[in-house]
C-alpha cells in the first residue's frame, strides 16, 4: 500500500523533487515552482473535503493534490502585508479556517472563499499570534511572550470576547489539542487539560529537565509523547498522573517541531534535521532524508 506524506518544509532556498523511498512512501515538495505564494510556509491543515491549506508569509494557499490556488486578505482594516504573514492556523468543524497572523486574527470560510476580520476586545488587537487552537465556540491564542489568551467567538459581531479563566495570561511551554478537542497546556510545573465545557484537570508535570516544545496526546490509547531538547519521552496517562515508559534520543537534533500519529505504535517526527519515523513499541526510529538544501523545520500532514 502506498502512502502520501506531505511535509511542509520551510525553505530559504528552493529545491524540488518527488521520489519514492522505503516502505513505498511518496514525498512531495511544494515550492514556488508549483505556485506557492511564498517560499516561507509556516503551517498546514486539511479540511473535510480533502484540500490542504498552507499558510505562508504571503497569504493562504489551497492545494488539491495537483494545483495551488492563492488567497490574499484585502479586507478594509487588514494591515497589509503583516496581516498576510500567516504564523498558525486551525480549522473548525464547519469549514472555517482561523488564522493567526503577524497583525492579529481573522477567519477564512472555505465554502464561500471569503475572509472575515475579527477584533479581540482587549489589548491583543493587531499583535502577532504565534499559536491558535479552536475548541467549539472558544479560541485559544498564544502571543509572542508564550502567554495564552482565551476568548469566546462572536461570529455575528466579528469579535472575540475575553473569558475569565485560570489559563488566561499564564506563560506556557506548549499547547496541544487532542482528537477529542481537549486542550492540553504545559507550563513549568504542571499540565492542565481544558475540556470543551472549559472545566479543567491538572497533572503534575513529568520530570523532564528541559522545556517541552512539542507534545502529542492520543486519547484512544492513553499515550503521551513529550519532545524536549531532541528527546522524546513516552508516557501512559493514568487517572491522576503520567507514568513513564521510555525515552527516545535523536542524536544532534536540537528542536523537534511536530509529531503526528500514523498507527497505534508509529509516529512521524518533524525536526530541524529531517523527518523521522518512530515506533514506540520497540523504541526504534528510521531517518527519512529529504533532499532539501537548507532546512529549518517540518510541519507534517500524513494520510
Regions found by a protein language model. Give the residues of each.
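Carboxylate-rich, polar loop motifs that coordinate divalent cations or form catalytic acidic clusters
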Residues: 1-303
Amino acid at each position: 500500500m502506498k502512502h502520501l506524506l506531505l511535509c511542509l518544509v520551510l525553505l530559504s532556498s528552493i529545491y524540488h523533487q518527488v521520489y519514492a523511498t522505503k516502505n513505498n512512501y511518496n514525498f512531495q515538495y511544494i515550492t514556488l515552482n508549483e505556485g506557492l505564494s511564498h517560499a516561507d510556509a509556516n503551517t498546514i491543515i486539511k479540511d473535510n473535503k480533502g484540500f490542504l491549506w498552507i499558510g505562508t508569509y504571503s497569504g493562504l494557499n489551497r492545494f488539491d493534490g495537483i494545483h495551488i490556488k492563492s488567497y490574499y486578505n484585502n479586507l478594509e482594516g487588514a494591515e497589509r502585508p503583516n496581516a498576510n504573514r500567516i504564523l498558525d492556523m486551525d480549522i473548525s468543524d464547519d469549514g472555517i479556517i482561523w488564522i493567526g497572523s503577524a497583525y492579529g486574527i481573522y477567519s477564512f470560510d472555505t465554502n464561500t472563499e471569503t475572509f472575515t476580520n475579527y477584533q479581540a476586545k482587549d489589548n491583543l488587537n493587531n499583535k502577532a499570534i504565534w499559536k491558535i487552537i479552536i475548541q467549539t465556540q472558544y479560541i485559544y491564542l498564544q502571543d509572542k511572550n508564550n502567554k495564552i489568551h482565551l476568548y469566546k467567538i462572536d461570529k455575528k459581531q466579528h469579535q472575540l470576547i475575553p473569558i475569565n479563566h485560570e489559563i488566561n495570561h499564564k506563560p506556557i511551554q506548549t499547547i496541544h489539542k487532542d482528537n477529542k478537542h481537549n486542550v492540553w497546556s504545559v507550563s513549568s510545573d504542571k499540565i492542565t487539560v481544558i475540556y470543551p465545557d472549559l472545566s479543567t484537570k491538572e497533572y503534575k508535570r513529568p520530570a523532564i529537565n528541559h522545556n517541552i516544545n512539542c507534545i502529542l496526546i492520543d486519547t484512544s490509547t492513553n499515550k503521551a509523547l513529550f519532545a524536549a531538547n531532541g528527546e522524546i519521552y513516552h508516557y501512559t496517562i493514568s487517572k491522576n498522573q503520567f507514568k513513564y515508559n521510555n525515552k527516545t534520543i535523536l542524536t544532534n537534533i536540537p528542536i523537534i517541531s511536530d509529531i503526528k500519529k500514523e498507527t497505534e505504535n508509529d509516529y512521524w517526527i518533524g525536526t530541524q534535521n529531517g523527518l523521522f519515523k518512530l515506533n514506540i513499541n520497540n523504541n526504534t526510529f528510521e531517518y527519512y532524508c529529504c533532499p532539501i538544501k537548507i532546512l529549518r523545520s517540518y510541519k507534517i500532514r500524513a494520510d
